[in-house]
């Protein structure tokens, strides 16, 4: 797992209070990890801060799964 993937996974575990075992690349933030809209906003903000990137609102709406977040951050770095 890449450094970005590890950091994204840690952010998700910290923000959503889920176990690391639940955070799989194909996991949906809402359906599999139980996130609501506020959780998603906080996740995006935490990722922006950790990776020093800005995630546009229209891009944030497309980040639905763990792998989407990892791929987006890797592309922006």
Curated annotation (Swiss-Prot):
Molecular functions (GO terms): acyl binding; acyl carrier activity
Name of the coding gene: acpP
Pathway given in the UniProt record: Lipid metabolism; fatty acid biosynthesis
Broad class of the protein's primary localization: cytoplasm
InterPro entries cross-referenced by the UniProt entry: ACP, ACP-like_sf, PP-bd_ACP, Ppantetheine_attach_site
Keywords: Cytoplasm, Fatty acid biosynthesis, Fatty acid metabolism, Lipid biosynthesis, Lipid metabolism, Phosphopantetheine, Phosphoprotein
NCBIfam families reported for this sequence: acyl_carrier, PRK00982.1-2, PRK00982.1-3, PRK00982.1-4, PRK00982.1-5
Record SUPFAM superfamilies: ACP-like
Annotated protein name in UniProt: Acyl carrier protein
Function: Carrier of the growing fatty acid chain in fatty acid biosynthesis.
Modification note: 4'-phosphopantetheine is transferred from CoA to a specific serine of apo-ACP by AcpS. This modification is essential for activity because fatty acids are bound in thioester linkage to the sulfhydryl of the prosthetic group.
O-(pantetheine 4'-phosphoryl)serine found at: 37
Any GO CC annotation of this UniProt entry: membrane
GO biological process: lipid A biosynthetic process
All residue ranges annotated as the Carrier domain in the record: 2-77
Family as reported in the entry's similarity comment: Belongs to the acyl carrier protein (ACP) family.
Source organism: Desulfovibrio desulfuricans (strain ATCC 27774 / DSM 6949 / MB)
Keyword set includes Lipid biosynthesis: yes
Location in the cell: Cytoplasm
Top-level taxon in the UniProt lineage: Bacteria
